[in-house]
From Swiss-Prot:
Protein name: Histidine--tRNA ligase
InterPro entries: aa-tRNA-synth_II, aa-tRNA-synth_II/BPL/LPL, Anticodon-bd, Anticodon-bd_dom_sf, His-tRNA-ligase, HisRS-like_core, HisRS/HisZ, HisRS_anticodon
Cellular component, GO annotation: cytoplasm
Keyword Nucleotide-binding: yes
Organism of provenance: Oceanobacillus iheyensis (strain DSM 14371 / CIP 107618 / JCM 11309 / KCTC 3954 / HTE831)
Alphabetical list of SUPFAM superfamilies matching this protein: Class II aaRS ABD-related, Class II aaRS and biotin synthetases
Gene that encodes it: hisS
This protein's record includes keyword Plastid: no
Transmembrane regions: none
Enzyme Commission number(s) from the entry: 6.1.1.21
PANTHER family cross-referenced by the UniProt entry: HISTIDINE--TRNA LIGASE, MITOCHONDRIAL-RELATED, HISTIDYL-TRNA SYNTHETASE
Record-stated family: Belongs to the class-II aminoacyl-tRNA synthetase family.
Length: 429
């Protein structure tokens, strides 16, 4: 038995985890500003949720899902994406009955896909996503894309671009579907096995094929934008009008096709143009899904959302050499001398922590020199020296590590003095 992490998974160690925490906290600030609320759905669902929601002709459903039977014989699947689960929860919990519409939701969570592991593509991936359900308004589409772009900009990323397209409504998609079949049918035998099947079930998927993307027929395939009816054209034009009003730069790519069946009308991706990012440049993707809620038995509830991989977000930050303003310094280290002072040190550390001051102490029975080295490694801003004399006098020696200044502080005033020296921003209430 291998005592290593399974293929396609990684351990997120503290030096990386702190970057994730910073990014996640920044994202949550933006969620608050845009008035989105968090939802948490199960890690696994009934397999039918993804078969019906994502589409049984997609690569995700046919090749990439982790599906198993429980002891009751029920087919369950680890979630490969977030939107289908949110739509299921929206219907099951009757969120459509709330007077506060549209419903604006966000989520963080692990997704699972059986893919060939490579840089930026893992079998367990961590995703942030948003869903706005209950409105078919071009202004909402623009808001969602603005939201996504704002995340990258707030973290200092500059080499990102927004790419958009319209997949049209059902009528437009049907016209495009028929044109695609006519176009690719003469080349059927030249296409890969998967695309031959897709041509019958969902020819739009042929355009998203990795194996056949260099086939000459791909370059001359009919574009969805040539088949948009008046409503779809007007809707897409209105989306672009709102993007222009928000000063959001974008590129229209008529070849942009999202890999999930539920998308219609607006589709978009955010890509990195940073040198050294690698072959996989997509950071986030999303679009509109007006029929998904009905697929789960709910009322007509148009929706739009996006998902972004947190692994790729961190990769993009590293590709642009962005150093996050993370304070990794410890507020205070309590150095003690002897068993009696160690007992007192535990009480001092607890009092500091209870008042919102980050504090630590020695648990390795180090001598004073070793404890000071530990304080240096923790980049501690202050060190409290606590020995028998300090306990008897009920005062400690407080040293500011950046200047070397030392002062005697009474136990009763320690918290107040330390909070003031730490700029008074961490008072516990």
């Amino acid at each position: 038995m291998s005592m290593k992490a399974p293929r396609g998974t990684v351990d997120l160690l503290p030096e990386q985890s702190i970057k994730w925490q910073f990014a996640e906290s920044k994202i949550k600030e933006i969620c608050h500003n845009y008035h989105y609320q968090e939802i948490r759905t199960p890690l696994f669902e009934h397999t039918e949720v993804f078969q019906r929601g994502v589409g049984d002709t997609t690569d995700i459903v046919q090749k990439e899902m982790y599906t198993f039977e429980d002891r009751g014989g029920r087919s369950l699947t680890l979630r490969p994406e977030g939107t289908a689960s949110v739509a299921r929860a929206y219907v099951e919990n009757k969120l459509f009955g709330s007077p506060n519409q549209p419903t604006k939701l966000f989520y963080f969570g692990s997704m699972f896909r059986y893919e060939r592991p490579q840089k930026g593509r893992m079998r367990q991936l961590n995703q942030f996503g948003t869903e706005v359900i209950g409105s078919e308004d071009p202004a909402v589409d623009a808001e969602v894309m603005d939201f996504a772009m704002n995340i990258y900009k707030s973290l200092g990323l500059k080499s990102v671009k927004l790419v958009i397209n319209s997949l049209g409504d059902q009528e437009s998609r049907e016209s495009h579907r028929n044109a695609l079949i006519q176009h690719f049918e003469p080349h059927r035998e030249e296409l890969c096995h998967d695309c031959q099947n897709r041509l019958d079930k969902n020819p739009l998927r042929v355009l998203d094929c990795k194996k056949d993307r260099d086939h000459p027929a791909m370059g001359t395939a009919p574009k969805i934008t040539d088949f948009l009816n008046e409503y779809s054209k007007t809707y897409f034009a209105d989306v672009m009008t709102y993007l222009d009003a928000l000063d959001i730069e974008y590129v229209v790519d008529p070849n942009l096709v999202r890999g999930l069946d539920y998308y219609n009308h607006t589709a978009f991706e955010i890509m990195s143009e940073a040198e050294g990012f690698g072959a996989i440049t997509t950071l986030a993707g999303g679009g509109r899904y007006n029929g998904l809620v009905e697929e789960f038995g709910g009322p007509s509830s148009p929706g739009i959302g996006f998902g972004m991989g947190l692994e790729r977000l961190i990769m993009a930050l590293e590709a642009e050499n962005i150093t996050l303003p993370i304070d990794q310094q410890l507020d205070c280290f309590v150095a003690n001398m002897g068993d009696e002072s160690k007992l007192e040190a535990t009480k001092v550390v607890k009092r500091l922590r209870d008042n919102g001051i980050q504090a630590d102490m020695d648990y390795q029975k180090r001598k004073m020199k070793g404890q000071l080295k530990a304080a240096d490694r923790y980049q501690s801003k202050f060190v409290i020296f606590l020995g028998d004399d300090e306990i008897e006098k009920q005062e400690v020696t407080l040293k500011e590590m950046s200047t070397g200044d030392q002062s005697e502080v009474s136990m009763s005033q320690l918290v107040e003095v330390l909070q003031e020296k730490l700029n008074g921003g961490k008072i516990y209430e």
